[in-house]
């Protein structure tokens, strides 16, 4: 995936630090009052520095500013425990497990101001 291809994706938000592109978050669909995040990528050389946590916190806050958004969902593969740990730390809870070639979890976070 090139930066040009990322820029062409709908509802794709660039993550930058000090003017440098370091990752992206993409909202892929809205179902009723739920927004589903489809992609969340951080440059692997920059993980473990809190940048992904900060970016996701800002993105969550931005989504919940819209009073019609009551929840946010995403999927995470079982073989990505660091991502699952990040989402859990940010208040996402596993709501479904999908078995398959690669086991994954559907996780959801509710807007605490509403619920």
Language model regions located:
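Terminal substrate-recognition subdomain of acyl/acetyltransferases
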Residues: 105-115
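Conserved acetyl-CoA-binding loop-helix of GNAT-fold acetyltransferases
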Residues: 42, 48-62, 85-89
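Methionine-biased hydrophobic packing positions in alpha-helices, especially
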Residues: 56, 92, 107-108
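Conserved acetyl-CoA-binding loop of GNAT-fold acetyltransferases
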Residues: 88-98
């Amino acid at each position: 995936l090139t930066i040009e291809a990322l820029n062409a994706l709908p509802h794709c938000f660039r993550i930058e630090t000090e003017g440098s592109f370091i990752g992206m978050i993409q909202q892929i669909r809205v179902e009723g009052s739920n927004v589903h995040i489809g992609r969340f990528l951080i440059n692997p050389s920059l993980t473990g520095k809190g940048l992904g946590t900060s970016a996701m916190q800002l993105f969550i806050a931005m989504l919940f500013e819209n009073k019609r958004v009551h929840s946010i969902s995403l999927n995470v593969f079982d073989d990505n425990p660091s991502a699952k740990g990040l989402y859990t730390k940010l208040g996402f809870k596993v709501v479904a497990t999908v078995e398959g070639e690669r086991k994954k979890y559907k996780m959801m976070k509710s807007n605490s101001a509403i619920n």
